[in-house]
Amino acid sequence: MKKTITASLLLLSSLGLHAQSGTNSPYSQYGLGELSEQSGSFSRGMNGLAYGLRLNNQVNALNPASYSALDSLSFIFDAGVSLQMTQFKEGGRSISARNADLEYVVAGLRLFRHVGVSFGLLPYTNVGYDYSNSAHINGSLSPESPTATYNNKYSGSQGLHQVYLGVGAEPLRNLSVGVNASYLWGGYTKYVTNTYSDAYVNTLQRTYTAEVRSYKLDFGLQYTQPLSAKDQVTLGLTYSLGHSLNADPELSVIKNNSQLAVADTTRFRISNALDLPHTFGVGAVYSHNGQLMVGAD
């Protein structure tokens, strides 16, 4: 009980630490952002292998059916921190980016015989980017200069976070099923700003925002087929329910002309424009004596 309370307090304290984005990539500007791996330390050591992974000393949140394998004598707590170093190149130019983030906090324990539970905090998507481009254009409204320079700046932040509670059971020998029930929250703020060196040309700023408060359901199944006394194969299947997030994204367009001292703001809103897709996963893991594993998802 004391271990469970301690892990719960650590999970709650990590909610504030997880407020910032865990990426620095222009690809995160699309949709709800870049999808997070959501895998634990052992799974990442096997390049993200998860759907058929079934261990008694590891929490595998990507397939809740695996919770039924948790050891009855141990309480598992796992937390991860990531450091991202990326280099982007385009048109002979390059830029480096570094990002550090609290990746996940998960815990798991056996509740009854062949029944295990897990809870934790995971990132679902990450939004984080900041880049710009500029060029010269012919023609200008200003009588002082026949040419002008424009600059387009793109930036965004936030993402979606996920806190979950899951249970896995083995109702039949070698067959396990499980479910994760999650609460999703977060959103995004994205900016596109067009500025010109010519003060007579309008500066245009577009701000895209959305706030999400919704749920997520993930189902899992695992079947283990013994091959010998030391060898076995585990097949894993997962399904995540797709549904509307009931979110209303907004676009705010601000036109500003410093020379004429004129500003104008227009706002647009689209109802129920964001959805979670239906997702499916399948994987298999071959294990020899609990020491050698080979698998694919």
Label each residue range with its predicted role.
Residues 20-44, 110-297:
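Outer-membrane beta-barrel porins/channels
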Residues 13-14, 74, 184:
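Single-residue recognition of alpha-helix boundary sites
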Residues 11-12, 54, 72, 189:
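Hydrophobic alpha-helical membrane-insertion segments
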Residues 7, 57, 270-271:
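Residue-level detector of alpha-helical transmembrane segments in integral membrane proteins
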Residues 1-24:
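Bacterial Sec-dependent N-terminal signal peptides
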Residues 18-125:
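N-terminal, post-signal peptide beta-strand-biased segments of exported outer-membrane/organellar beta-barrel
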